[in-house]
Amino acid sequence: MYTIADTVGGAQVPLACAGLRQRAPRFDLVENRLERGLQLGLLTPGVAQRTRLLARMLDSASLSGEEMGSAFGISRAAVHKHISVLRSAGFVISSQRGLGHSLVEAPESPVPELVTLLLLGDPRMPAPGEAGFLGLPYHHHAEVGSTNDVCRGLAEAGSPEGTVAVAEAQSAGRGRLDRIWCSRAGQDLTFSLLLRPGLAPVELGLLVLAIANGVALCLAEDVGLGSAVGLKWPNDVLVNSGKACGILMEASIDMDRVRWVVVGIGVNANSRCSELIGVGGTPPGKEPPASIGDAVGSRVSRPALLVSLLARISASLHQLDAEPGAVVRQYEGFDALRGRTIRLTSGYGGRELARGVADGVEGDGSLRVREAGGGVGFHGAGEVTVESVAGE
């Protein structure tokens, strides 16, 4: 649980964690954005009303049911019903005769009302209906097979760009090349994001880099990990040379256009590194798992982390639209492979595609490799293994 204790600009906000510099929700934004989200059908009236109640409780020491009902045009009984739902979602709300209701603690889980409040109150995120808005509709599940599978179904059903599916646990989580992705229930952050980009299939390589940039910037700047954050082509996010986040992008393509893209992101948020290493240990040439919580030395607020990731990804997608070359330059600042001796295969233990020194990425997002014979190869896909060399 995170105590509602920090006061920023006169408004109490959820304490995120040491290291995650969570911006206080902009309450002046929340109400207008809630109305717009309702008009667009991006959230239900119940979630919207409970988000309003949370915002009001955060903005005041305490409020009576009568005051809340009057402010929102609902009965005291309806107020009590909404508060009961919030309590069942993990919010600790104090109710005292003569003093009213006050919010004491927020849940660690990324429940819809808390995520909606943080999302709509974040000035970095465009408003619902504006280009670049991400995060709604929001689907929060206790357990699914895979959030990517859930999001693929939503995509085919016509859900709009920006739809997010989050799960506390996955029974069939997967990464690139059909590898198993393991995450601990209630500890880590696993979610999928639906995009409907106006891209040609050949441009998907740059989209991968843009998403990776957004995640890296969130961890480096918002979480405060700085130079400890790196990117291993194409989209592994490293912290202190260990893998802290995996990204899986799946797309539906019709001839010369991309219908939709589902971006699955798994972050080792609060698991300990010792809990993530399998019985067989880390394969040679591969990165051991890393944990954000271990790196910052405290638990991470998953709701705050999710919203910050979405805001950073939104900005990266805007950069991709406005200046594709800037995406490559941004990526190069995080490139953890450049200058390393690598082997590129069709899969772990698969057919060798290239061997040499990684030399950055091309304008289309492909990996540039300077091979031992002096040639230069360009590769749009493959599995990278870092080889041990003398002095390294």
List each model region and its residues:
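Active-site glycine-centered loops adjacent to acidic/histidine catalytic or metal-binding residues
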Residues: G173, D236, G266
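Basic polycationic patches enriched in arginine
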Residues: R21-R26, R33-R36
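Long, positively charged amphipathic alpha-helical accessory segments at protein N-termini or as interdomain linkers
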Residues: R23, E31, G41-S62, E66-S75, ...
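N-terminal lobe of the biotin/lipoate ligase/transferase fold
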Residues: Y2-A5, C17, L40-E221, S252
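Intrinsically disordered, low-complexity segments enriched in glycine and mixed charged residues
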Residues: D6-G10
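Low-complexity, glycine/proline/serine-enriched flexible coil segments
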Residues: V13-Q22
